[in-house]
Amino acid sequence: MKFKLIAEYFDRLEKISSRIQLTSLLSDLFKNTEREVIDKVVYLIQGRLWPDFTGMPEIGMGEKFLIKAIAMAYGNKEEEVEKLYKNIGDLGEVAYSLRSKVKGVSILSFVGGNQEAGELDVMEVYNELVKIATSTGEGSRDIKIRIFAGLIKKATPIEAKYLVRFVEGRLRLGIGDATVLDALAITFGGSADYRPIVERAYNLRADLGDIARVIATEGIEKLKNISPTPGIPIRPMLAERLPDPEEIMEKMNGKALVDYKYDGERAQIHRKGDKVTIFSRRMENITDQYIDVTEYVKQFVKGDNFIVEGEIVPVDPESGEMRPFQELMHRRRKNNIAEAIKEYPVNLFLFDLMFFEGEDYTTKPLPERRAKLEEILASNDKVHIASHIIADRVDKLREYFYQAISEGAEGVMVKSIGPDSIYQAGSRGWLWIKLKRDYQSEMADTVDLVVVGAFYGKGKRGGKFSSLLMAAYNPEKDVFETVCKVASGFSDQELDEMQKKINELKREQKHPRVVSDMIPDVWVSPTLVAEVIGAEITISPLHTCCRGEKGGLSIRFPRFIRWRDDKSPEDATTNQEIMEMYSKQLKKIEEKPVDENI
């Protein structure tokens, strides 16, 4: 399959903002994609070479490397490329412009002989990009530049444009996983009615390229038989939130299992034979940060093939008391991990079992999952079952909540124990409800919002980003709707971090998945997630979250709490959750029903 066809579709997709049109065109691309490369095409659409959970390296070519490669490919001086880049502001367009001026293919040391421009095929492109990503050690920088220069030299202008953007991490297609799932269902199932089957398979095996390969080569019926696979993460089950214990117990029909909600890092732990792998909430491979935890699991959790879930929590080695979540940040550094492991010890608190020795436990009710989890855990002081009770009264839930807070937990997770209490992978529902600490605010809880824009500061902050445009996620439309502008709560260190984060993700135009009336100084690709608290939720004509006749919903006096690197944009607080918080706030504060006209 020719890569030029992919590039031409990318060019068309980039110009579309309607999700319906995006889905239709993406489906058309899949129909024209050869079955043996469809997984690679899906990865390219996602802007990656492989799923994050593989732990494989990224491309590793920054702006300066790309400028050198473009100059080498087209016979220009680096200064000329830099000047053109300053004028155009897009290295992909720079490559397109320079390649358009080159006639034929000049001599360049590159494996591939005298291949003519436009003859690149998808597998050739993919394999060369893999070589670039996996090139390490002495001289790897020059190898990466030379390989990429050779690749774009053989490319047509449109291919060069999207190859550069891919390597730079700026594809700008505006396509989320939900849109890909819709397109796969339409292409290989015949209609969007098959979306639940495709989505369930993806929730249990979070490798979108592999799901595309299975449905394209073996048919949609094959997806119905997909079950969890150790080594491939399951999309985590998510909880709803409520501030009132009485209302929570009503939702649970008067009886529920109540776990501590630990202030740690949620972890999905897979064992396949002798290999133990740990995935974050975002399904990234974080095994290297928790080598000690892998050893604990091997020692104390019985079985050779299983998937369990829990919370990794920093603890005081002397007292065993829980320590602040921030201590885990020390384990994210690339150097001296062994020292960090020794200095910042952790315990693992398990709360679920999804797969054990060939059996899918996601379809079993929670009491059965928990009983098996307790059965396979040997007594020890490193790995524990999450502290829990069975609550059948509101006062019992309330007392346990205060006990959890007093012992350093964030709150509690209240979980259904009924016959339908399955593990809903990738879904947010009322089977789990979180009750967190009251922040002494009209907002009963923090929210996790996505950065979609940034504003420059004034005075001593002049020339630097000092506030962020934040959005909630609308899962029905697969878009991000603005809800507030955050300018307070940042420490000096966090402000410095903000500059780097925003500069890496800034873009000239609004991302197609962002719905905003407010125009920031800089648009940002919706990738970063931050935890935010505010005074209350109000109606605002400036924001688009849950917009109705009177405006959208907005958070008054928002304050930054912390970055949530463990969450993906799609894990952010949803527009519906914001609406529910607003409704409950009105009921509590104004003692009148929610205005249905918003």
Curated annotation (Swiss-Prot):
Q: Which residues form the active site?
A: K261 (n6-amp-lysine intermediate)
What keywords are assigned to this protein?
ATP-binding, Cell cycle, Cell division, DNA damage, DNA recombination, DNA repair, DNA replication, Ligase, Magnesium, Metal-binding, Nucleotide-binding
Whether Cell cycle counts among this entry's keywords is yes
**E.C. number:** 6.5.1.1
| The protein's enzyme class | ligase
Q: Where does ATP bind?
A: D259, R266, R281, E311, F351, R428, K434
Which Gene Ontology molecular function entries are recorded, alphabetically? ATP binding; DNA binding; DNA ligase (ATP) activity; metal ion binding
Question: Catalyses which reaction?
Answer: ATP + (deoxyribonucleotide)n-3'-hydroxyl + 5'-phospho-(deoxyribonucleotide)m = (deoxyribonucleotide)n+m + AMP + diphosphate
Q: Does the keyword Ubl conjugation apply?
A: no
* Co-factor requirement: Mg(2+)
Gene Ontology BP, a term:
DNA recombination
Q: Could you name the domain of life of the organism this protein comes from?
A: Archaea
Q: Its function?
A: DNA ligase that seals nicks in double-stranded DNA during DNA replication, DNA recombination and DNA repair.
Could you tell me which NCBIfam families the record lists for this protein?
Answer: dnl1 (TIGR00574)
Q: Which family does it belong to?
A: Belongs to the ATP-dependent DNA ligase family.
Q: What is this protein called?
A: DNA ligase
Organism name: Metallosphaera sedula (strain ATCC 51363 / DSM 5348 / JCM 9185 / NBRC 15509 / TH2)
